[in-house]
């Protein structure tokens, strides 16, 4: 297996292809877009609050806007941390819980659906820890719901299996779970030099 750390010279986006996707897939993709707004672009988050239905209807202007913003957010993070030494960990917002749910559900949930549930779980935990206000936690949850994404762990998920799966996450250190947290809307919590995960 060979991996390269070369960045693309150009990114091409075919918005017309989005129109061929079923609504569940569009919603699933929107989870990552909402995540990008939460972790690095308040303007994107606020745009989605006003226009999420247009995106689901594949409005050309709305889709072009979020496609461009998605690329910009990810580019900023990846170019500052090409080799995944710290900052890039912020792209895992919602993924600690989300990946575990996705696996334990035996992939009955799309990736974005599982990430949406994980984002709500991490926002609620972040609220308890004082990183995000109740108002902003509710904004995240409501936007995910408007994007037609689940926000609660389905009843069929075995809770014991889920907890066990959480401990296989790549961010676990010395047997301790670590989460990344958003700071209100549009920023990430930093817990020291190049430290974005918290036990």
Language-model features and meaning:
Residues 14, 119, 185:
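Residue-level signal for inorganic ion chemistry
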Residues 9-11, 114, 178:
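Structural motif
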Residues 46-160:
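Active-site segments that bind and position negatively charged phosphate/pyrophosphate groups
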Residues 31, 131-199:
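C-terminal charged capping/lid subdomain of soluble metabolic enzymes
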Residues 2-6, 82-83, 171-173:
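Solvent-exposed alpha-helices and their adjacent loops that cap or buttress functional pockets
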Residues 1-53:
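A glycine/threonine-rich phosphate-anchoring loop and its flanking beta-alpha core
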Residues 7, 87-88, 177:
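A generic hydrophobic-helix recognition signal that picks specific residues
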Residues 5, 12-13, 92, 180-182:
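Short beta-strand segments
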């Amino acid at each position: 297996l060979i991996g390269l750390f070369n960045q693309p010279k150009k990114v091409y986006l075919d918005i017309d292809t989005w129109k061929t996707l079923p609504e569940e897939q569009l919603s699933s993709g929107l989870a990552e877009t909402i995540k990008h707004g939460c972790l690095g672009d308040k303007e994107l988050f606020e745009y989605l609050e006003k226009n999420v239905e247009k995106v689901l209807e594949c409005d050309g202007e709305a889709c072009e806007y979020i496609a461009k913003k998605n690329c910009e957010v990810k580019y900023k993070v990846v170019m500052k941390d090409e080799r995944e030494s710290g900052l890039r960990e912020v792209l895992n917002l919602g993924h600690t819980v989300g990946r575990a749910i996705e696996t334990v559900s035996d992939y009955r949930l799309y990736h974005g659906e599982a990430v949406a549930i994980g984002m709500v779980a991490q926002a609620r935990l972040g609220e308890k820890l004082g990183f995000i206000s109740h108002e902003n936690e509710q904004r995240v949850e409501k936007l995910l719901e408007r994007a037609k994404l689940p926000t609660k762990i389905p009843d069929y998920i075995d809770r014991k299996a889920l907890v066990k799966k959480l401990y296989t996450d790549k961010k676990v250190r010395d047997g301790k779970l670590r989460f990344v947290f958003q700071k209100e809307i549009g920023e990430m919590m930093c817990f020291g030099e190049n430290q974005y995960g918290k036990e």
